[in-house]
From Swiss-Prot:
Protein name: Chromosome partition protein MukF
GO CC entries: cytoplasm; nucleoid
Highest taxon of source: Bacteria
Species in which this protein is naturally found: Actinobacillus pleuropneumoniae serotype 5b (strain L20)
Protein family per UniProt: Belongs to the MukF family.
């Protein structure tokens, strides 16, 4: 029996050769085709006049900053080019006195549909598509259980599965491939942001990572919820084919649909796993950049403090200018005088390394019981508790040390599930932290 599922490679090659396709679309030509497609969708009869096409080309020409003087000539060249490449069909008659009517071809519809509709991939659209698939497969399985001759199977089982279910599966698969491209674009945007000014780009990177992770998780949940039911219905139909050698074409179609469904579902999970790995890589890069760029962070905080200096409600009152000059003499006398007595502890010098070692030892002693007793570490609560014991000038170093010591002990199980925690305040100066509870400790 002739394979009714798809054409063979030689058939497709001969078909292409007979039609002599030669496709080449520059950016302005593609924009012109998309404009024609969108305008055509708004027309009731689907027919376009040459004046309509010239008006559409005028919009494209303005966007691409092309000369107005040669507009008509370039519009005619663009129209003839689309007709030659079979994106448009031209119809003319001796009764229309040279006026032509244009209709967009299936090839033009397909190319425009790829660039316009397939980018609208959302959970709502996916849910509607899966709902339609479920209804079609349900009707097909009910018809299969009724039984009948080959013609009955062809009309009531094979036709809806091939021309409805299979096409929707192909549409979902194509949309997933568009999301692959979208992920690559997001990665390029994140790389560009981090290469310019990573400190200012952290918030934008977090937003892009969160949005993409949430979209992938939501779409995968929708696929998982419907996948098992669809596979069960396909198995129902397949069980009705036992002993029916005349229905091999239906059995082959069922196998193809099962493979497509498995590929769609597995793609979603694989995309999530890959994105989680990329997410961790970006966060690791940011943490490393912070550790390597302490001087820059300090410099930025210093510049910020200078910029905010005049916002403080401080007023200096000057009076008796001569007395102020006299103070200089007193200062000179004090500088020349010999210092006696003990220096207050607040003014004693402590090296930064000694201070950090003290804080590290204290934090290790504080966090060790959590690991020993298997208790989860809530970084937000620990940071709030410890920062309250230190002056504000040490909050940055203390917070960094606490996070470093906690990460060495273990990790949060929610991180592997792409679950992002809420921001928590850790002091009364507006500092916040975003961290899941650490509940898996290293051995």
């Amino acid at each position: 029996m002739q394979n009714e599922l798809a054409q063979t490679i030689p058939e497709l090659i001969n078909w292409t050769k007979e039609r002599e396709f030669s496709l080449s679309l520059s950016s302005d030509r593609l924009a012109f085709l998309l404009a024609i497609s969108i305008y055509n969708n708004e027309q009731t009869d689907g027919e376009l006049l040459e004046s309509d096409l010239i008006d559409l080309f005028r919009y494209v020409s303005e966007v691409f900053d092309q000369s107005e003087a040669t507009l008509t000539q370039r519009a005619n060249n663009a129209i003839n080019d689309l007709v030659k490449q079979r994106f448009l069909n031209r119809f003319s008659s001796e009764f229309t006195e040279g006026l032509a009517i244009y209709r967009i071809t299936p090839l033009g519809v397909g190319v425009a549909d790829y660039y316009v509709r397939q980018r609208e991939f959302s959970t709502l659209r996916l849910s509607i598509q899966l709902s339609i698939v479920a209804d079609e497969i349900q009707r097909a399985s009910s018809a299969a259980e009724e039984g009948g001759d080959e013609r009955f199977w062809r009309n009531n089982v094979f036709a809806p599965l091939k021309y409805s279910v299979a096409e929707i599966f192909d549409s979902i698969d194509l949309s997933q491939r568009m999301m692959d491209e979208n992920q690559h674009q997001i990665r390029e945007r994140i790389a560009e942001l981090l290469s310019q000014n990573w400190h200012e780009a952290i918030l934008s990177c977090e937003q892009l990572l969160d949005e993409t992770s949430g979209n992938l998780r939501e779409l995968q949940d929708t696929l998982n919820a419907a996948g098992d039911k669809l596979q069960a219905q396909l198995l129902r139909i397949q069980s009705c084919l036992i002993g029916r050698d005349d229905l091999d074409f239906v059995d082959q179609l069922i196998v193809n649909l099962q493979n497509k469904l498995d590929r769609i579902i597995s793609w979603g999970q694989q995309a999530i796993d890959l994105w989680i790995g990329y997410d961790r890589h970006v966060h690791k890069f940011i943490r490393t950049a912070i550790d390597m760029d302490k001087n820059r962070v300090f410099g930025q905080r210093l510049r910020q403090s200078i910029q905010d200096y005049f916002k403080c409600a401080l007023v200096t009152l000057y009076c008796e200018a001569e007395s102020l000059l006299d103070l200089r003499d007193d200062e000179t006398m004090l500088n020349e005088a010999e210092a006696v007595g003990e220096l207050p502890s607040e003014l004693e010098y402590e090296s930064l390394s000694d201070v950090q070692e003290q804080i590290i030892s204290v934090m290790q002693a504080h966090l060790a019981p959590f690991r020993a007793e298997g208790k989860p570490i809530d970084l937000g609560a620990v940071l709030r508790e410890q920062l309250a014991l230190y002056p504000q000038s040490r909050h940055f170093d203390v917070a960094r040390i606490i996070v470093d010591q906690a990460v060495k002990l273990g990790m949060a199980s929610l991180d592997s599930q792409a679950v992002y925690p809420e921001w928590q305040a850790i002091n009364d100066k507006g500092a916040e932290v975003q961290a899941n509870v650490i509940d898996q400790y290293n051995k």
